[in-house]
Amino acid sequence: MDINQNLGNLMKEAQKMQQRMQEAQQQLSQLVVSGESGGGMVTIKMNGRHDVTEVKIKPTLMDEDIEMLEDLIAAAVNDAVRKIEKASKEKISQLTAGLNIPTDLMGDKEGE
């Protein structure tokens, strides 16, 4: 292949990737996950845009130490964020599976 053909193929792959990324962003924005802490004492619902849409606190926690409640809320939010990030990575992996993109261009630094 000559360089023009390589560039043409690269542009086609980039266009496919852009379209797939837009589709993935749309799908991920509709995703809703639940993060929890304290064995379900605090539950947070978060969408794919990282917006917290619901907070549930067991009534028995309202009589507890406020610092513990704050810690449980933070832990539940962090749990939800981790779930969103995992779902996002899985979706991106699915999208890039059929494309001829070098893996070092994907910014995956888990192996480092």
Swiss-Prot record:
Major localization listed first in the record, in broad terms: cytoplasm
One GO cellular component term noted in the UniProt record for this chain: cytosol
Keyword DNA-binding assigned: yes
Subcellular location: Cytoplasm, Nucleoid
Record-level Gene Ontology MF annotations: DNA binding
Cited Gene3D superfamilies: Nucleoid-associated protein YbaB-like domain (3.30.1310.10)
KW DNA-binding (keyword) present: yes
Keywords: Cytoplasm, DNA-binding
PANTHER family named among the record's database cross-references: NUCLEOID-ASSOCIATED PROTEIN YBAB (PTHR33449:SF1)
UniProt subunit comment: Homodimer.
Record family assignment: Belongs to the YbaB/EbfC family.
Primary role: Binds to DNA and alters its conformation. May be involved in regulation of gene expression, nucleoid organization and DNA protection.
Protein name as catalogued: Nucleoid-associated protein lpg2755
Protein's organism: Legionella pneumophila subsp. pneumophila (strain Philadelphia 1 / ATCC 33152 / DSM 7513)
